[in-house]
A protein has these predicted regions:
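Single conserved hydrophobic/aromatic residue that forms the stacking wall/gate
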Residues: 1-7, 12
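Conserved ABC ATPase "signature" region
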Residues: 17, 24-61, 109-112
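Conserved ABC ATPase signature
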Residues: 65-69
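Helical segment within the ABC ATPase nucleotide-binding domain
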Residues: 105-118
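A short, surface-exposed alpha-helical micro-motif characterized by mixed small hydrophobic
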Residues: 132-134
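Catalytic Walker B motif of ABC-type/P-loop ATPase nucleotide-binding domains
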Residues: 90-93
Length: 170
């Protein structure tokens, strides 16, 4: 039920606020015995959610239902969720799949900013070499569980094993 709510029936600000932070039992005790602390914490979470929304340039969508977002906007929202918990290592599996070029550029910009300004590290699985080339250096190209190539994207695009594996022989 929570996944359904976070995924589609909440506005993006509220969706970000649902991301669990500290999971200690302390929060339950505070909710029962110190309601003013809970109100203060909720205010801080709301403020952080708005910072994340602004950082990702989604302020024009802050009240939009998450379920109404495009695929690329949902992927930006997913990045926002990692920001809510201050994840410093983020694994991205084909983050660019199904995303239009404009939003892919926005997604790349957000990833770059998170890396440079906030110290996030990304491990990405991606097939779009142009997208990866903008974000990663070096790259590792794998096929069927084996490393085919390790080096720059430009060199990967010229490597015979990479070309054969991904483009086939004409």
């Amino acid at each position: 039920i929570l996944r359904r709510l976070v995924g589609s029936e909440m506005c993006i600000r509220d969706s970000l606020m649902m991301v669990p932070g500290n999971q200690s039992g302390e929060k339950l005790v505070n909710a029962l015995l110190k309601p003013s602390l809970v109100a203060k914490e909720e205010s801080q979470i709301k403020e952080k959610a708005m910072e994340v929304i602004n950082f990702l340039n989604l302020s024009h969508l802050k009240n939009e239902l998450a379920g109404n977002l495009s695929g690329g906007q949902k992927k930006l929202l997913e990045l926002g969720r990692t920001m809510m918990v201050d994840a410093k290592l983020v694994l991205l599996d084909e983050v660019g799949a199904g995303v239009n070029r404009t939003l892919l550029k926005d997604l790349g910009t957000a990833i770059e900013k998170l890396n440079k300004e906030k110290g996030y590290t990304f491990c990405m699985i991606e097939h779009d070499m142009d997208f990866i080339g903008r974000l990663c250096d070096p790259v590792i190209v794998m096929a069927e569980g084996s490393v085919l190539f390790e080096g720059s994207v430009e060199d990967a695009k010229k490597d015979e094993k990479v070309i054969e594996s991904y483009l086939g022989r004409g």
